[in-house]
Amino acid sequence: MATLEDKLLGEKLEYYCSSSEGEDNGDEGGDNKGASGKSRCSGLTIDTNPDATPAGGFRQQSSTNTGPKGVVKDWQRFKQLEAERRDETERQRLALAKKLTITATTSAEDEERKRQEELDAELDELMSEDFLQQYQKQRMAEMLRQTGHHQQFGQVQQLTSHEEFLACVEQENKHTTIIIHIYERQLAACATLNKCLDSLASDYPSIKFAKICSSVAGMSRDFRTKGLPALLVYKAQAVIGNFVRLTDDLSDDFFASDVESFLIEHGIIVDRALYN
C-alpha cells in the first residue's frame, strides 16, 4: 500500500524535481540549458525567456490609464486643442479684417484724391481771368438792376436855370449817379469836354449827364477864369465828386477815353466792359 508520501509524490510526480537526476546529467545539461534558455524539472518545462509569447498567444502590454484621472486629462487636452484652434481662427480673422481694412482705406483714399483733383481743376477754371471777368460783368449787371440803373438817359441834358439844376439833383433816383459839367462858352477846354461827355452819355446810358453855364449856375468871375472846366458829381443829393480845372489832369488836348479813364480811376463810374 502506498504511503501518504508516495501518494503525494505520485500526484506531483510531474512537478517533482530530482536533485540526483540533475547531478547525473550535469555535464550534458550544462550545454543544453545555455542553448535553449529553458530548464527542465522532472518533465516540467519552464521558459525563462522574458520575450517569449505565452502559450495562449497573448502578451501583456502597458496601456493608457482609462480611469477618472485619465478621463480628466483627456478632457483637459481636448479643451487645450479647442482653445488653440479658436486662437488660430481669431488670428486668421484679424488678419483678414486688417487686409480688408487696408483695401477699403486705399479705395477711400483714391476716391478722396480723385475728388480733390476735380475740385482743384474746377478752382483753376474759376480762377481763370476769363471766368473772373465774366462773373464780374454778371455781378455788376445784377447790382445795377437792383440799384435802379435800369433807367436810361443816353444824352447830356442842358440845364438853363438854377431851378433846373436843383431839380436835376434833388428829384433823381437816389441810386443814380449825376455828372454835371460847369462850363464857359469861350473856353476851348470846356467845348472839348462837352464833346467828350456827349460820347460818354451814349456809352453809359444809366448815368445822368448834364451841363450848365457857369454864369447860370451863379459862379464868380474868379472861378470862371481859374476853375473851369469843372465837374460836380452827385448821388442821393450828396456831392461825391468835385473836380475843378480838369486840364491840370487831362492836359489841354484830351479825348473821351481820357475822361472815361479819369472818372473810372476816381470811382465815379464803373468800366462799361464789366457789364456790357
From Swiss-Prot:
It comes from the Eukaryota. One of its GO terms (molecular function) is protein folding chaperone. Gene3D superfamilies: Glutaredoxin, Phosducin, domain 2. Residues 18-74 are annotated as: Disordered. One of its GO terms (biological process) is chaperone-mediated protein folding. Keywords: Chaperone, Phosphoprotein. This is Phosducin-like protein 1. Functions as a co-chaperone for CCT in the assembly of heterotrimeric G protein complexes, facilitates the assembly of both Gbeta-Ggamma and RGS-Gbeta5 heterodimers. The keyword Phosphoprotein applies. Forms a complex with the beta and gamma subunits of the GTP-binding proteins. Interacts with the CCT chaperonin complex. The modification Phosphoserine is found at residues 18-20, 42. Residues 153-276 are annotated as: Thioredoxin fold. GO terms for cellular component: cytosol. Belongs to the phosducin family. Residues 62-272 form the Phosducin domain.
